[in-house]
């Protein structure tokens, strides 16, 4: 079977990822804003006895290296191994797109043109003469539409053309040299694109979509109220996360608790019962139960992304962001940080200014990722009534964003000084969300969350259980056996009283074993570090394990708080937290989690994007100092207020 390697190239926001999803049934992230693809991705499919590997390159307006994403595309086209170029253009904005097409033609590589968003062009009254366009460019032009499954157009034909073009005897230029980007060269490509577009386009423009966009923008992009409208949308999303997801989460939590209690009651081997019930079910179950809240959060953000609203918010906030040393383009990485810090760090590649890029990288971690949400929900649910929980959750996220801005300003004034870049961006048209794309966005992120729960969160929970069980406290065990024997021989006690007394002795033994274990001893030292905020050793240990993944914080607490609580009528997880942790300590714990260093995977990505291990060290010091300082302030402020 022959393999065909296709380089997928196009300007930002032309639907490259949507097209590749339609061709291969992949689930690449799709968004109605520039910078969704920030590194090359590849998918493979079989078509007519050929394995077609499509490499989705970052969107670029021209073949230069002003930004990291543009450099990735240029370097691959010059040095990468591929058989042909599939150039995707926006049919509703052909002239601008053809400037890049003209550059690609000058590489003398086999090329195919996909006229994407053909359905939208038709709706807007734009008619493109594909035969004449093919003659002008000397390549086959295929009209395509990939926005939804129902509206797909010519995806099979496009694959046929890829195979046909690959099979042609024309030779490729093996020594690809991307054309220079001097002003004179840029002007030449722009003029060429303008001439070709005029010759192939006949318009009977239907201005309805533009009128609708203008009317919507008059409201959403209002100079005074636009920001408050955006905050309103975010408040609704967080409130619904707690309102809708919270009910399902409580049901799942109760289900896992029943399962855990059942295992501990029916498994004869006490250690095995504790491992499965407290370690695996208590740890992993505590994490999985928060999935419904995360699904609602992902749904809301995906809707805002696919409609094109997020790009407008970037423009709306540009003035504010510049005052704090950031850039309008910083908004997309920052808002992406609400989902996961890893793609957020990678999304900073769209920033051209080195200092602005580094500032954005350093403050992304203050935008609370979805992995922190279960921690917030657990503690907010423990200390605040359900009626106000959504508002408190919203305030947590807003506080994180405000601190990110303040820290960005401090970094700008002290470390990363220099001129700021002007902000020029393309405003995409408002589009009705593709429910299929929204579904796949939620599906892939939820699946990733569950994979974490089933892999290293599971491993982490088991390790925490073992380290919290061993070594045993032999002296306490000896005392327990002696006192248990005395209780059993005491004729003055009823059977019910004996059972209750034995349970109390067992609970006391478990607590002593826990303090004598590896985790207990290590936690005693950590407790001294966090003593000013009155964090006990269990909270302290969970913060350390949270560096592996923030989801592990909840699973660690689930393991440590379930051990030593052998009462079958024990309260739910929130009740245990409320009983064991003071309100000031709980608030301080939330604040520390908000600001301390991201998970291991995100930290590695940060180091790669920032430029080396020294920046990771700077990030650790920076985030730890910020987290400790704000946590301390929150603790004493809450003590005064409560």
Swiss-Prot record:
Residues bound to GTP: 116-119, 145-147
Residues that span the membrane, as ranges: 226-246, 279-299, 361-381, 388-408, 447-467, 541-561, 586-606, 615-635
Chain residues that bind GTP 3: 56-59
InterPro entries cross-referenced by the UniProt entry: Fe2_transport_prot-B, Fe2_transport_prot_B_C, FeoB_GTPase, G_FEOB_dom, Gate_dom, P-loop_NTPase
Domain FeoB-type G: 3-168
UniProtKB keywords: ATP-binding, Cell inner membrane, Cell membrane, GTP-binding, Ion transport, Iron, Iron transport, Membrane, Nucleotide-binding, Transmembrane, Transmembrane helix, Transport
Top-level taxon in the UniProt lineage: Bacteria
Membrane topology: Multi-pass membrane protein
GO (cellular component) term, any one: plasma membrane
Binding-site positions, GTP 2: 35-39
Molecular function per GO: ATP binding; ferrous iron transmembrane transporter activity; GTP binding
Subcellular location: Cell inner membrane
Family statement drawn from the similarity comment of this UniProt entry: Belongs to the TRAFAC class TrmE-Era-EngA-EngB-Septin-like GTPase superfamily. FeoB GTPase (TC 9.A.8) family.
UniProt-recorded name of the protein: Fe(2+) transporter FeoB
Gene name of the encoded protein: feoB
């Amino acid at each position: 079977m022959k393999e065909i390697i296709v380089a997928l190239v196009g300007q930002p926001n032309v639907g490259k990822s949507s097209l590749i999803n339609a061709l291969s049934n992949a689930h690449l992230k799709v968004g109605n804003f520039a910078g969704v693809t920030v590194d090359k991705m590849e998918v493979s499919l079989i078509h007519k006895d050929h394995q077609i590997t499509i490499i989705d390159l970052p969107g670029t307006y021209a073949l230069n290296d002003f930004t990291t994403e543009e450099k990735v595309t240029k370097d691959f086209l010059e040095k990468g191994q591929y058989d042909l170029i599939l150039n995707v253009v926006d049919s509703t904005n052909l002239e601008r797109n053809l400037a890049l097409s003209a550059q690609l033609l000058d590489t003398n590589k086999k090329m195919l043109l996909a006229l994407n968003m053909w359905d939208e062009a038709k709706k807007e009254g734009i008619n493109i003469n594909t035969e004449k366009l093919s003659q002008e460019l000397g390549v086959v032009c295929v009209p395509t539409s990939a926005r939804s499954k129902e509206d797909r157009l010519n995806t099979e034909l496009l694959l046929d053309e890829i195979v046909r073009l690959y099979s042609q005897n024309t030779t490729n230029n093996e020594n690809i040299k991307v054309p220079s980007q001097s002003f004179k060269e840029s002007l030449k490509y722009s003029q060429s694109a303008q001439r070709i577009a005029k010759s192939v386009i006949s318009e009977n423009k239907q201005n309805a979509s533009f009128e609708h966009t203008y009317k919507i923008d008059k409201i959403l992009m209002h100079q005074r109220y636009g920001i408050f409208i955006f905050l309103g949308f975010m408040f609704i999303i967080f409130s619904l996360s707690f309102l809708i997801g919270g009910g399902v989460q409580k049901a799942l939590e109760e289900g896992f608790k029943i399962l855990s209690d059942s295992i501990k009651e029916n498994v004869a081997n006490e250690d095995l019962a504790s491992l499965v019930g407290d370690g695996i079910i208590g740890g992993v179950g505590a994490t999985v139960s928060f999935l419904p809240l995360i699904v609602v959060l992902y749904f809301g953000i995906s809707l805002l992304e696919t409609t094109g609203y997020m790009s407008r918010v970037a423009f709306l906030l540009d003035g504010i962001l510049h005052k704090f040393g950031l850039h309008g383009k910083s908004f997309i990485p920052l808002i992406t940080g609400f989902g996961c810090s890893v793609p957020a760090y990678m999304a900073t590649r769209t920033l051209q200014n080195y200092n602005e890029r580094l500032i954005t990288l350093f403050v992304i971690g203050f935008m609370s990722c979805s992995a922190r949400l279960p921690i917030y929900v657990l503690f907010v649910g423990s200390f605040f009534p359900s009626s106000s929980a959504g508002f408190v959750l919203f305030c947590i996220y807003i506080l994180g964003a405000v601190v990110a801005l303040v820290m960005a300003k401090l970094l700008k004034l002290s470390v990363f000084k220099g001129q700021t870049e002007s902000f020029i961006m393309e405003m995409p048209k408002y589009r009705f969300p593709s429910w299929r794309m929204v579904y796949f966005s939620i599906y892939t992120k939820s699946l990733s969350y569950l994979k974490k729960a089933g892999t290293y969160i599971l491993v982490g929970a088991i390790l925490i259980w073992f380290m919290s069980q061993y070594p045993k406290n032999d002296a306490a065990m000896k005392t327990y056996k002696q006192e248990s024997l005395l209780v059993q021989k005491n004729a003055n006690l009823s059977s019910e009283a004996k059972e209750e007394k034995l349970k109390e002795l067992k609970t006391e033994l478990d607590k002593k074993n826990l303090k004598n274990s590896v985790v207990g001893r290590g936690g005693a030292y950590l407790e001294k570090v966090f003593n000013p905020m009155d964090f006990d050793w269990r909270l302290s240990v969970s913060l350390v394990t949270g560096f592996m993944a923030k989801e592990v914080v909840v699973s660690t607490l689930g393991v440590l708080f379930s051990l030593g609580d052998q009462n079958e009528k024990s309260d739910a997880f929130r009740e245990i937290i409320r009983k064991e942790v003071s309100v000031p300590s709980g608030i301080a714990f939330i604040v520390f989690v908000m600001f301390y260093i991201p998970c291991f995977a995100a930290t590695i990505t940060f180091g790669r994007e920032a430029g080396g291990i020294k920046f990771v060290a700077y990030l650790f010091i920076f985030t730890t100092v910020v987290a400790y300082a704000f946590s301390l302030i929150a603790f004493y402020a809450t003590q005064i207020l409560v």
